[in-house]
Amino acid sequence: MKTMSIDRRELLKAGLAASAAVALPSAARADIHFEPRPGAWRTFEVVTRMEIGKAERKTQAWIPVPAVNEPEWFRSLGSQWTTNGSASLAHDALSGAEMLHVEWPDGERNPVLEVTSRIATRDRATDFAKPGRPAPLAATERESNLRGTELIPVDGIVKETSDKIVAGAKTDVEKARAIYEWVVDNTFRDAKTRGCGNGDIVAMLKSGNLGGKCADLNALYVGLARSAGVPARDVYGVRVAPSKFGYKSLGTGSQIVTKAQHCRSEVYLAGFGWVPVDPADVRKVVLEEPPTNLAMNDPMVLAARRVLFGAWEGNWLAYNFGHDIALPGSNGPKLGFLMYPQAETAGTRLDCLDPENCRYTISAKEISAG
């Protein structure tokens, strides 16, 4: 068998030349300005309307409502609702996730509800050159953000993978960055994945198929970070506005945001506090940013990759940080996360991604800026 020797220096030169050729941008793509910065607050009104088809006997619904309050970047300003059922707010005791629980009696053939929430949001950015003195995590909060969940364990293959990724990293910042780069390099956004994915990171790692959507890829980031001893958490929500930085893939196309759910993630770093991290959106840019299927060295991808470790745009509503959520009044299984409206009729959980039987719309409009 013939062997081939490769001169590493020549290979590097060839690779750089090829990369430069591929990366030559058009004038428009060369002038990318993706720089989220904390500034003016933007206020949005978000309306979720649900109508449950084929209602049989007792029917219930659970609608996530904003429960996140972070003084630097997000404020939940309250929710109101109308319904022909009986409604009350419910909380997940462990995570603080909040939902509107609505019940309809037997015989109500046309269950309907409408929830209106107001939120204020703004951009985030971390200056890694200027560490500060953020409040340390309380022991209970630190423990909860290092603990495994049903879909995000921190042992076994997750721990083994994390150990390999962070080998040689000396600080939490280095570990967090190494995991981010690994997820960006080794995963992909799979257009065939339903919804935002199910977040089963063990199945991903065991199969070797690291494709999925945000609830998969960012959950993988969180699991790997927690396994490395770095507190991390998912933040479940929905995009509510176009990107002001020209990314079609990172914003909405209209006021109808029914399918704009998006899970982001955060990692807690000494000197910086909770830091935004979103490797899944880097892979979304690769797959979906026009003209689609971009190369990793495309300027739009490079800008997203640079920015989304440490910053994100405030065109998005945060519902909660919850995992393993039991829906009050339901005998069905726990949810891995609560990001979509949920419903049951006659004791059967409806498919929240089935528009025929679990009909809902979500709309968003900006009501003030500044």
Predicted regions span which residues?
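Active-site neighborhood of thiol-dependent amide/isopeptide-bond enzymes
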Residues: G168, D172-A176, E181-C263, V285-E288
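N-terminal secretory signal peptides
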Residues: M1-E10, A14-L24
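Acidic low-complexity segments
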Residues: A90-D92, M99, V112-D190, R194-G208
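Intrinsically disordered, low-complexity N-terminal segments that are enriched in acidic
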Residues: L12-G15, A30-A125
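Short intrinsically disordered coil segments
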Residues: L77-Q80, A129-A138, P279-V282, G336
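A mature extracytoplasmic/lumenal domain signature
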Residues: V65-A67, S117-I119, G132, Y236-V238, ...
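Active-site rim recognition segments
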Residues: P242, G246-G370
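Short loop/turn segments at secondary-structure transitions that flank enzyme active sites
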Residues: A67, T121-A125, R189, V240, ...
